């Protein structure tokens, strides 16, 4: 009688057969989906290695199979590694869309993207890069000597396909490491250069120039890269590229455009074009939703727009400037946007009658007719504007904030402190300090008597054990710090006086007389 197979092993066999209905039936009976064969492969890994089992991959993922299950060994890894190695683009898209981690490395320290590049699967490379890249698009690179740029700059640039990729998943505890990957063409699977941006010095482009560029200096190889937008003067694309180099993902999709001298792709590869489109991650979508919600709440509360709105007049710069009067302390020229109109500003005239002071007794109709007759009048858009928000001011200073007289410091109390030391036999205190009219004439005996009668201070105890009375003194500093047992212990360990940390040459016992 043979051994009965488990339900998990039956699921593995149904995957090899491509029987999706059988897999669902076994799963309904409680069968697991993570059975491992003798080679370490799970059912999802087996289905990810065959192009005809794309429907089985879909069923296993829907039933709860672990897309990041790891298979140890050389040229192994997760199901995404196996699909990328086989060049199965649809399977790669399916795994990535259901939470497969593209940053997991196998035992050879290779990611799924590395395996796809090594095997030459261009479509899989573009699919993975389109999912995780911060920027991908055509750029121009200067490859000639720097002194020739002034003579023939158009002949010293070449088109490249630039992709900015993170090396690992986003982690809030450490900065994100980015790589700039340069391909000579879109159909190339292996990059021409890989630049580690966290080891490079990035120069910000000067957008005031006609044709700005981004300069990247690799400190490790001492190589300088100068990149320009594919269209001369396209500052928007250069801004996207520079922001991606700084770690800011781009929401705008960078659809790759074929260069003029590139061969036409095959129809099969053209169908994979949407895979190159950069899609924002879940964190970016949540951040965009939060920003939009804050903007809508600000509009609903009537917060005025802080961006200045310049108005143009027909006076050929001979009219009054649109700046506020009294060096910026006058009333604003534009009113706050209304709730119903969103961010539509209400444009008013930059100058008014009598420099902001209207003649009393004139109505609004008379003033409007005067403005219509003037040449530098502007059209006023009727909007329901909210009253201007009060400008916060600093609180007034109190009268006694500043003092002109001399500074009065507190007086120093010169009264001596009473110090009481009990005797070793438990008797009365024998030494103290007594305040007297003339401190130099005070006698020790009188001080001891006063100290024994005063109950202001507790009897002296050992500062180390806080239990025994003070019995010894440290020589040469003379501090009466503690009992003999504690002081002997400190002397044997050569720790020094517990009060002043001075070196102890001798410990003497004190006797009360």
UniProtKB/Swiss-Prot annotation:
It comes from the Eukaryota. This is Probable E3 ubiquitin-protein ligase XBOS34. ANK repeats lie at residues 39-69, 75-104, 108-137. The gene is XBOS34. Residues 361-378 have a biased composition (Low complexity). CDD domains: RING-HC_XBAT35-like. Keywords: ANK repeat, Metal-binding, Repeat, Transferase, Ubl conjugation pathway, Zinc, Zinc-finger. It catalyses: S-ubiquitinyl-[E2 ubiquitin-conjugating enzyme]-L-cysteine + [acceptor protein]-L-lysine = [E2 ubiquitin-conjugating enzyme]-L-cysteine + N(6)-ubiquitinyl-[acceptor protein]-L-lysine. Its EC number is 2.3.2.27. Residues 309-378, 423-455 are annotated as: Disordered. Pfam families: Ank, Ank_2, zf-C3HC4_3. Pathway: Protein modification; protein ubiquitination. The keyword Repeat applies. It comes from Oryza sativa subsp. japonica (Rice). Residues 436-446 have a biased composition (Basic and acidic residues). Residues 309-327, 335-355 have a biased composition (Polar residues).
